[in-house]
UniProtKB/Swiss-Prot annotation:
Signal peptide: none annotated. It comes from Cereibacter sphaeroides (strain ATCC 17023 / DSM 158 / JCM 6121 / CCUG 31486 / LMG 2827 / NBRC 12203 / NCIMB 8253 / ATH 2.4.1.). PANTHER family: PHENYLALANINE--TRNA LIGASE BETA SUBUNIT, PHENYLALANYL-TRNA SYNTHETASE BETA CHAIN AND LEUCINE-RICH REPEAT-CONTAINING PROTEIN 47. Tetramer of two alpha and two beta subunits. Residues 39-155 form the tRNA-binding domain. GO terms for biological process: phenylalanyl-tRNA aminoacylation. PROSITE patterns: B5 (PS51483), FDX_ACB (PS51447), TRBD (PS50886). NCBIfam families: pheT_bact (TIGR00472). Keywords: Aminoacyl-tRNA synthetase, ATP-binding, Cytoplasm, Ligase, Magnesium, Metal-binding, Nucleotide-binding, Protein biosynthesis, RNA-binding, tRNA-binding. This is Phenylalanine--tRNA ligase beta subunit. The gene is pheT. It catalyses: tRNA(Phe) + L-phenylalanine + ATP = L-phenylalanyl-tRNA(Phe) + AMP + diphosphate + H(+).
Amino acid sequence: MKFTLSWLKDHLETEAPLDEIVTALTDLGHEVEGVEDPVKVLGAFRICRVIEAQPHPNADRLRLCRVATWPNGPDAPSEEVQVVCGAPNARTGLVGVFAPVGTHVPGTGVDLKPGVIRGVESNGMLCSERELMLSDDHDGIIDLPEDAPMGMRFIDYKGVNDPTIEVKITPNRPDGLGVRGLARDLAARGLGRLKPLPVEPVPGLFPSPVSVTIEAALKEKGCPLFAGRTIRGVKNGPSPDWLQARLRSVGLRPISALVDITNYFTIGLNRPLHVFDVAKITGGLRIHAAEGGEELLALDGKTYKLRPGQMLISDDAQPESLAGIMGGELSGCTEETTDVFLESAYWDPITIAATGRALKIVSDARYRFERGVDPAFTLPGLELATRMILDLCGGEASEVVMDGAVPDTSRAYRFDPKRVVSLVGMEIPEAEQRTTLEALGFTLEGELAAPPSWRPDVQGEADLVEEIARVASLTKLQGKPLPRAQAGVPKPILTPLQVREQAARRTLAALGYNECVTYSFIDEAAAKLFGGGSEAVRVENPISSEMTHLRPDLLPGLLRAAARNQARGFADMALCEIGPVFAGGEPGEQQLQATGLLVGASAPRDPFGSRRPVDVYDAKADAEAVLAAVGAPAKMQISRKVPGWWHPGRSGAVGLGPNLLATFGEVHPKILREMDVKGPAVAFTILVANVPLPKVKTPTRPALKLSDLQAVERDFAFVVDASVEALTLVNAAQGADKALIESVRVFDQFSGDKAEAQMGAGKKSLALTVRLQPTDRTLTDKDIEAVSAKIVEKVAKATGATLRG
């Protein structure tokens, strides 16, 4: 958005210099993209008088001029300089414009230096308008009236000394699309006083011959308010010079007084208006939704075909305007126009944005309406524009006609001065906070603050804090050191869950896994394969059909990654991921999971034959390593109760009582086929948050106690039912004497037809190694036999096992 400094000062009473205003605008959130200051470009060019002009002694087309200049202004003494000039109108007594040595001439891009032209010294330059980039006239040097004040800056005499400021307005600040909105922010900052904007209703002298109606369905969403009035007897000639100059300065082409006035209000007060030629309207105006197929020749000379639902302004005969976007050519005003209908309406931002985007029309009106103009200024803007038309174009106004009502945008939020410190960290006195909000147009009543109608972006208490901090300047926010603990060790920065997550990630990396980061969204079919896919985790507005549900497990994403790698020739891989999984949409139904996936072989090919397919024991070992890293206790139970996506008989679950900690095993072949993964593939999943925290926290780790006495190992072979799990035997043997037994491990299993032939149908043999570690004395044979008897007794009681003969 562009505006001039004088335009800003129409609304802001200030003595602040331009640089301070520009800096303040950027600091307030309105980024200044550029400043065109004529003073910096043309400030050195001053009015002068040619005392004498004689022919150049060495050139027929050049003139040798003695010029009286006032380099220090009209009140300072004059200086005489010699200038060689080639303009045909250079003559004695001419009043022109002089550029001294050292001046940059914008029209030529040259910095003036003392020179010698055809053997004669020349100091400075007599300028044409093209050399000053004021016009394309280069027939001669500037020729001013005799009464032009000597020594005055030419830009002041010409009236082209008004700086132009271009500001980038963010989409959330539609009030900044008017000069008055920017002036209000600057006044709140303290750079001046916002001038009042009195609105005096213009009395209606006759009923308006043009009526207005809004289609009932559009009053709720589309056009809540449409107002206007007829002004008859106007003279639609060129607008005044000051208005034309102001519009040109912001890049708008003056057209006629009526059109220029509407553009003036659009830029100055953020109030888009439109004028219809009454003579070209049949009956009244109707705001309605297009049925589809209607065509309108717009003011840009293009014909637009409307779709069903897009808003139109039509008379009794045909469409006349694209509502809130652009007027129609057929009802446009010309120099012959004498009676006009002035429109001021409030249009729904979403509807205007959708129509403008569909028709690919960009206009100043659309740009403002789709961001949200002030609905409460609809009628005051109509009155102010009416007064200006009467002043510049004459005529008389009718009574105001309208349909609809001003939308109720009133709302209030709690105003707590302490929130500025807690949210922003700035200490601003309460009185200053209240003054700031009131200067911005907020209404304060007790602990409530009501935003003005022109601020649709303010939607909560945090926005009040933002306004206060913005006006006070966030550049004043100073860094403060973090508070130090008064005594003792400071609290850890990371939570226990974050510490465990880091430990799991480091352990997986040490085990050789490559970490993946997959989407939290998967398709419904994949979600159902892993126990998900319910409506509770369906994404309302998915990115694509492959991301419709929140993932119930990390395995689908890792399997998809494995399939993509296999398709590119990578058969062996170790992938892992740590992230959230979702069982439902309620609080507490989200968990942190650490998952590893092994596919293919355990090692590269080598001459020693160590390469083998990955198996369930690889997954189990890695799962135990990660569990140990996150603090899981050594004694955990392993069961076969695993979900259906694991291979039955080649998988297991790790838990503490009813608390599930992890699952591991081969991925079910059906799942591999569905996910397009070529096996073998084993995996494990760990629910990190389910691992219990230590009950007792010690300041330091206790010293490791090692016995000086020699350990003793004894082997036991038990005959058990084929259904008995090895872990049951291990746990039973471990519990025989917890003080002496250091470890129990399975070292052999004998099963199958040969085993049953020796031991009976449905039987197998499991062999255990039990390590006994004394701490106070060396074990005797009697001690060892006693412990062995306990082990046999415990195992027999737990499993019905007998010692193998």
